[in-house]
Amino acid sequence: MTTYSDKGEKPERGRFLHFHSVTFWVGNAKQAASYYCSKLGFEPLAYKGLETGSREVVSHVVKQGQIVFVFSSALNPWNKEMGDHLVKHGDGVKDIAFEVEDCDYIVQKARERGAKIVREPWVEQDKLGKVKFAVLQTYGDTTHTLVEKMNYTGRFLPGFEAPPFMDPQLSKLPSCSLEIIDHIVGNQPDQEMVSASEWYLKNLQFHRFWSVDDTQVHTEYSSLRSVVVANYEESIKMPINEPAPGKKKSQIQEYVDYNGGAGVQHIALKTKDIITAIRHLRERGVEFLAVPSTYYKQLREKLKMAKIRVKENIDILEELKILVDYDEKGYLLQIFTKPMQDRPTLFLEVIQRHNHQGFGAGNFNSLFKAFEEEQDLRGNLTDMEPNGVVSGM
């Protein structure tokens, strides 16, 4: 595991502020938004569809804390772009939006460095103000929308209105206390992690923040490599994973196979009270990965010799299957959902940090074993040939 302290030069202009929103392209936006509200504690924020004059695409926007998810679907049978995306990838993340300052400058610099500009800067407005946008292409079919608010005071973005319906059940369910997007992870095919991470360093002036390789993260069967890139202020963190060759197909390779290439593997959501959050998410019916039971026995032994003290009761963490990772300065608590759709692609993470800025490297091996058990149930923990090809494919 390597942590990097060199951020490089501070960009003179064009600051990246934070994650603005994540857009999912799904088969049924209404149902997807409802699922995330009832299961995960989001609330309807905004809507765009036929009733608001949007004739091609319908979008339901949901929010929890500062986390904003947009679920979009095609309204017409001739929408080839969204239709093809759905067939290839299934329901999943299409766009990760960043709120920025000086969108024009960021686009100009990215263009000079060779980035593909999907859509040049444009402005949208309504009676509540103006917003400037631009869209860049990153890994796979994923895009980044840059969002520059020009004194905009609306609930979300121009063209969106208040949700047409508020589910009366939502107010009766326990609060989940998820506050902010901590990081968003992209999975790449083998040998594409470096080029995907370099894209951020070159085109967006991000820097390397953290990394692990397959000598540090591996089980008997499979392994991964990961690099985390971040903006100068480190308010946006983007881990990039790739599978490393092993005896069996790794969970990263399984993702790439079912997603039809690179894409967003998981979104980590931060909370200040993970015990209450997970209790309530479990009560709402969210399914989580369970690590082997030996994990907590080993954890108790290791913590006896650790320099830090975990404030939370380990018995409760074990009951809820929350994981702990630590160093000499602090610790983090984390847990991962099972896939959010039938394809074993996108899942979510809930994380709480106590003076610890890592990504749970100490848990990777236990998690990999948990992932492998799930893979085996799906019939996907298959042998790899010496050349890295899955046998029997």
Swiss-Prot record:
The reaction(s) this protein catalyses: 3-(4-hydroxyphenyl)pyruvate + O2 = homogentisate + CO2
Domain annotation VOC: ranges: 18-149, 180-338
N6-succinyllysine: modified positions: K132
Keyword line: Acetylation, Cytoplasm, Dioxygenase, Endoplasmic reticulum, Golgi apparatus, Iron, Membrane, Metal-binding, Oxidoreductase, Phenylalanine catabolism, Phosphoprotein, Repeat, Tyrosine catabolism
GO MF annotations in UniProt: 4-hydroxyphenylpyruvate dioxygenase activity; metal ion binding; protein homodimerization activity
EC number of the protein: 1.13.11.27
Cofactor note: Binds 1 Fe cation per subunit.
Entry-annotated residues carrying N-acetylthreonine: T2
Bilayer topology annotation: Peripheral membrane protein
Protein localization: Cytoplasm; Endoplasmic reticulum membrane; Golgi apparatus membrane
GO biological process: L-phenylalanine catabolic process; tyrosine catabolic process
Pathway it works in: Amino-acid degradation; L-phenylalanine degradation; acetoacetate and fumarate from L-phenylalanine: step 3/6
Residues modified to Phosphoserine: S211, S226, S250
SUPFAM superfamilies tied to this protein: Glyoxalase/Bleomycin resistance protein/Dihydroxybiphenyl dioxygenase
InterPro entries the record matches: 4OHPhenylPyrv_dOase, 4OHPhenylPyrv_dOase_C, 4OHPhenylPyrv_dOase_N, Glyas_Bleomycin-R_OHBP_Dase, Glyas_Fos-R_dOase_dom, VOC
The protein's role, per its UniProt record: Catalyzes the conversion of 4-hydroxyphenylpyruvic acid to homogentisic acid, one of the steps in tyrosine catabolism.
Quaternary data: Homodimer.
Name the UniProt record assigns to this protein: 4-hydroxyphenylpyruvate dioxygenase
Annotated organism of origin: Bos taurus (Bovine)
